[in-house]
Amino acid sequence: MKINFAAIKFRPSLSSEPVVIEDIHKQIADVIWQRKEVAAGKFALKLYDNPEVEVDETEKGYIREAVGEFRQWVAAPILELFED
């Protein structure tokens, strides 16, 4: 299944709803909707690391914020488990 990452915009904050533009597969939209923090972070990381995907400055801002959310709400609590 191909995903058009450029057609996805991430939530600008934890309190806002995800914004999906253009046509993407419904199941991807469902994942983002149901598992907002984790899915947004994972998709953002994939997109952020993929030099083939072209995004505009607004989308880059959404990506940076989603990566930050992923780190704050998912990665940080996991890392805390390994701290002395």
Describe the residue ranges of each PLM region:
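Positively charged, low-complexity terminal tracts
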Residues: M1-D84
